[in-house]
Amino acid sequence: LDPKVVQSLL
């Protein structure tokens, strides 16, 4: 997964 997607989930 892209870092941006991960941050969005957090």
From Swiss-Prot:
Residue positions, PTM Leucine amide:
L10
| Superkingdom in the source lineage | Eukaryota
Chain coiled-coil ranges: none
Keywords from the UniProt entry: Amidation, Membrane, Secreted, Target cell membrane, Target membrane
Q: Where would one find the signal peptide in this protein?
A: none
Q: Where in the cell is it found?
A: Secreted; Target cell membrane
Tissue specificity: Expressed by the venom gland.
**Per the record, GO CC terms?**
extracellular region; membrane; other organism cell membrane
The UniProt entry's sequence similarity note says: Belongs to the MCD family.
Task: State the remark under miscellaneous.
Answer: Negative results: has no activity against fungi (B.cinerea and C.albicans) and bacteria (E.coli and S.aureus). Has no hemolytic activity against human erythrocytes. Does not show cytolytic activity against insect cell lines. Does not induce feeding disorder in lepidopteran larvae after peptide injection in the vicinity of the head and thorax.
This chain belongs to the protein called Venom peptide 4
User: What lineage, starting at the top, does this entry show?
Assistant: Eukaryota, Metazoa, Ecdysozoa, Arthropoda, Hexapoda
